[in-house]
Amino acid sequence: MDAYFDEEDKKRRAENVYRQYPVLRDKKVLLYAPTFRATAEENAQLLEKFDIAKICQTLGDDWYVLVKLHPKFPSENITLHEHCLNMTDYSDITDLYMVADCLVTDYSSTVVEYVLLDKPIILFAYDLDKYDRGFYRDYRSTVPGDIAYSTEELLQLLQKNVDNAQKRQDFAKLQYDYIEGGSLDRVFAILQKE
């Protein structure tokens, strides 16, 4: 987790992305990283509900949308827009976190790491009532961002330029005992005591 607090490492990771995708430099970036679903039909809905054309139109030319689906998702099925890049085959999602200005996800564990960067998060839970994999905590009351239950609600949240800082802070406190880095030093100190 220390990588999320090391400014040099964050810059290096962002530069990895910019070197490969220079069009992203000086643009705002929305990262869409949903969790994998059990059936092909449910997985197809991930991109039907996340209407890339409408989202790109709503965000405007200053934004790029990065789509990072689960590696099991057939990435050739992704229809893109001129302001959207398929990053499904990109090897390290942490690099993508560093260039993203906002994360859109659903039930994915990506929020547990991304929340450490203290950037806006939107939860796109269009199928919450049907999603049956269970949660450790009550989803609606503990997620680190605003929830959109439909494509229209997602578009509205994107237009509002959501912040949700308090929700992120509350979520981070639920997940972590320490939120300032230094994990390696703490582990080393414990090992030295033994």
Predicted segments with their positions:
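Catalytic binding pocket for nucleotide-activated donors in carbohydrate/polymer assembly enzymes
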Residues: T79-L80, S109-Y176
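Charged helix-capping and loop-helix junction motifs
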Residues: A44-I52
